[in-house]
Every structure is written in C-alpha cells, then in structure tokens.
Design a protein with these regions (language model features):
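An acidic, phosphate/nucleotide-engaging active-site surface
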Residues: 1-64
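Solvent-exposed alpha-helices and their adjacent loops that cap or buttress functional pockets
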Residues: 5-8, 35-45, 59, 74, ...
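Active-site glycine-rich loop that binds ribose-phosphate moieties when present
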Residues: 28-38, 69-78, 83, 88-91, ...
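Ferredoxin-like iron-sulfur electron-transfer modules
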Residues: 74-133, 139-147
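Flexible, glycine/charged-enriched surface loops at secondary-structure junctions
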Residues: 112-114, 142-146, 219-250
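Conserved mixed alpha/beta catalytic, RNA-binding, or beta-rich assembly cores of soluble enzyme
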Residues: 133, 137, 142-153, 167-198
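A hydrophobic, small-residue-rich beta->alpha segment in the mid-to-C-terminal subdomain
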Residues: 187-236
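Conserved small/polar residues in nucleotide/adenosyl-binding loops
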Residues: 255-260
Length: 266
C-alpha cells in the first residue's frame, strides 16, 4: 500500500512478523501496562536497530513519531492488537443507517447489523478505530480519553522492549506532514511546510525535537489545521498552540514547550 517493495527501495524487504503475522518473539519489558511485548521475530534477531520515521499527525496518538513507529510498527499482529485494545467504539443507533460499512472494514467481524442498525461486539473488537473512519453518518464513537492515554503508554513500553539492551539509532523526516496516519491509503494535504531531517540515539529526545520544530512552524492555511485555527479565531474560541492537538482535539495530547534548561541541552 505504501510502496515498500524491493523495486521501490532497492533492497530486500522483510515482513518482521512473517507472512501471516504470527512469527513473534515475547520480550520481557516489565512495564506498567505491558509485561511481555509481542515483537516481530526479525526485529529481535537484529544485532543493531535503526529506525526511519515519517513524522506526521495522527488521529489517535496526536502525532506519529519515532516512538509510535517503533512501538506499533515492530509489534506483531497480536502486539498491535494488544496496544489498540482500549477505548472500544459504540454505535449511536439513532444516527446509524445500517449501511454495513463498519462491518465490511472490520477484520474481526465485530460490527453486526441487526434490524438495520449496527452493534459492535466488544469481545471481538480490538479497538483499531477503522469503523469510525468509514461511517458516513459519524454514528460510531469511542471513549478517546481512555483509549488515547492507554495507546500511548503501551506504545512507549513496546518501544522500550525493542530498543533495550542493544545499539539503536533513529532518523525522523519532517516532510509532507500529513494530518493522519500513513496506514491510510489516502490522506489530506500537509498541515505544515517541510522542515527537514533529524536524528538521535534517543527516541524520546528525537520526538521532542520534532514536536518543538513543528509547533514553531507556520501552518498551511488550506490544510485541516489551518482551517481549524481559522474557525477558532472566527468564533473567538481559544486557539491551542499545539498544532497536533488543534488538528485532532480528541487526542487530548497537549504540547509542553521546553524550559530554557531543556533548550540548552543540559
């Protein structure tokens, strides 16, 4: 979908968790939310880990940076499900038209149409949120306050599982800063101008630096971010200085500018 093949990259492409997503290594992490991360075996077989990240907005995580790329990207299919399993959506029956789009997009058969209304089986649902994106009536919603917080906690602990006890290096590209995740086959125009390439041995420092630069940049006026800011000004609403929170207010992630001590690198 995103063009990662030997023909485009000029090198071999390995699917880290195998052809069916079941080739995984259980990595002890002893986190608060994850005790044993399910990581694609090819990732854990590597002596050195190098990540390359496209920094962008994200409709659930706030922004997609190095930590999200490592934590979610290196998880096996079961690992991805474990990270997504909070904040399961529900259907507002009065708004549902029974079109079945949610059922067709779901890989787990969670949405079921009964009497022309959809209902989501939470025992089957993994909380991936695809059904929210395809509903033509916005009849599906999730408790984002819980799901966003838990998703970010788990991604951080999965990233620790990948990076601990071996040499790591991380590169992040701040270009074509799309409002949504690259998982989608489509996207909107970039919310920010191209900024450049950053690199670090520390994934947390790298994400912080990328967020700092993005929040210092002038938004693209015709983007969803630019329109949200214009709408806030027009209606005399409070305008958040966090560009990613302004793009996706439901993420509940608020940017904290670095202190002078942090900016000096001390």
């Amino acid at each position: 979908m995103n063009g990662f093949s030997p023909y485009q990259t000029g090198c071999h492409v390995l699917i880290a968790d195998g052809l069916k997503g079941t080739d995984e290594t259980l990595v002890p992490v002893n986190g608060e939310y994850v005790k044993e991360a399910k990581i694609g075996s090819a990732i854990m077989d590597a002596d050195v880990f190098i990540s390359l990240t496209h920094f962008k907005g994200h409709e659930t995580a706030g922004f997609g940076g190095t930590i999200k790329n490592i934590g979610m990207g290196c998880g096996s299919r079961a690992g991805k499900m474990e990270q997504h399993c909070e904040g399961k959506p529900s259907v507002a029956t009065e708004a549902c038209i029974g079109c079945g789009a949610c059922g067709r997009i779901c890989a787990h058969g969670a949405p079921v149409i009964t009497d022309h209304k959809a209902k989501i089986d939470h025992d089957k649902c993994v909380g991936c949120g695809r059904c929210l994106a395809v509903c033509p009536k916005d009849a599906i919603s999730a408790d984002y306050a819980d799901s966003v917080a838990m998703l970010n906690y788990k991604m951080a602990e999965y990233s620790l599982a990948v990076c601990q006890n071996r040499p790591c290096f991380h590169v992040s590209l701040i270009c074509d800063v799309s409002p949504n995740c690259d998982c989608h086959p489509e996207n909107d125009i970039p919310i920010l101008p191209n900024i450049g390439m950053l690199a670090s041995f520390d994934p947390v420092a790298l994400d912080q630096a990328c967020a700092d630069l993005c929040n210092q940049a002038t938004p693209v006026e015709s983007s969803v971010l630019g329109k949200n800011i214009a709408h806030a000004h027009e209606h005399h609403e409070e305008c958040d200085h966090d560009h990613f929170h302004m793009t996706h207010p439901d993420t509940c992630l608020l940017y904290t500018s670095p202190s002078p001590r942090d900016q000096r690198g001390s």
